[in-house]
Amino acid sequence: MAAELSEKYFQMQDLCRAAMEYAREIVKPGMNLRKFRAMCEQYLLDNGADSFWWDNIGAFIFSGDETAVSVLPDRYEASDKCIEDNDIITIDLSPQRNGVWGDYARTIILQDGKVVENISDIRQEEWKNGLLMEELLHNTLVDIVNEDMTFEELHERINTLT
């Protein structure tokens, strides 16, 4: 039973990864964030999600200065603004199928209207440094976490790194 449930979670995460790749393929300057959100949510529904677990929002999408804002789902509405040639976009996906959640967030950088593939190629230093720090934290987490570790142990271990 546990293996079957784990497989369902892996499938939802695979859906999220595919949806994020789709988002990277379709994002372009001039695209309205509301339209972008709708396209991402439709992709999730067309490819296996039956609903969205976080207040029925399947894709939280922010760009520019909005990426530094934290918004509760009951107050979220995608901005009626367009993506710029040089922009930072955050996407947080929350699909579900039969009560099994997917949860996946990424940042996309556009430079001269094109998605930047490598962090080292980002010209905007603040964005580059933020993504480098995120990468460092992720790699550190992967290096120190194991199946038997409690959240308390993880918290203690992370605090020793600062």
Feature names for model-found ranges:
Residues 1-162:
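Active-site neighborhoods and metal-handling regions in enzymes and metal-associated proteins
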